[in-house]
Amino acid sequence: SEMKEHKLETYMKKENIIFIGMPAVGKSTVGVVVAKRLGKKFIDTDLLIQEQEKKLLREIIAEVGEDGFLKIENQVNRDVDVENAVISPGGSIVYCEEAMQHYKEIGTIVYLQASYQTIKQRIRNPKKRGVVLREGQTLKDLYDERCVLFEKYADIIVNEDQCEIGDTIENVLEELSRL
């Protein structure tokens, strides 16, 4: 509707949108399309980390461990200073409290939610997907641990079970227009 279009436009002028969720929910894919549709820039903060450190994520994790990586992830995301952007951080961003507080202040946090079944089907091989599991931790453990945090920080929750990526994008835009 016209009213909704207008609302999306005014709301989207300077506003940032931050996508959070498990690996394989399509944060980057959905993020890029939403950025195009709303005339925003798109930022993948994993790429910012690689740029800053001049190394691949897995090399950083291999060198400094998961805790060392989270320190870097927190710093890079906390220092993101933009307006009118769509930002897609890595899944472990929810462990970075300062970064998440920063995102709460500069934008709207959209949690792309999917059931464990959906995630498990999409992540056949966690290691290949760059999913870091601690000693003895299963993907289900990681899922349960992170979901609590995703829900805590989310301004909007969009569920994508049984959804094609196109549906998810429409649902995100629909939710944003309601704000």
Task: Set out the residue ranges of the language-model regions.
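A glycine- and Lys/Arg-enriched "phosphate-lid" helix/loop adjacent to the NTP-binding pocket
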Residues: 105-148
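P-loop (Walker A) phosphate-binding loop of NTP-binding proteins
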Residues: 22
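ATP-binding Walker
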Residues: 25
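NTP-dependent small-molecule kinase module
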Residues: 7-14, 33, 37, 147-179
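Post-Walker A helix-loop "phosphate-sensing" segment adjacent to the P-loop in P-loop NTPases
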Residues: 36-45
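Hydrophobic anchor at the beta1->P-loop junction of P-loop NTPases
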Residues: 19
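Walker A/P-loop
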Residues: 28
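ATP-dependent small-molecule kinase phosphotransfer cores
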Residues: 45-93, 97-101
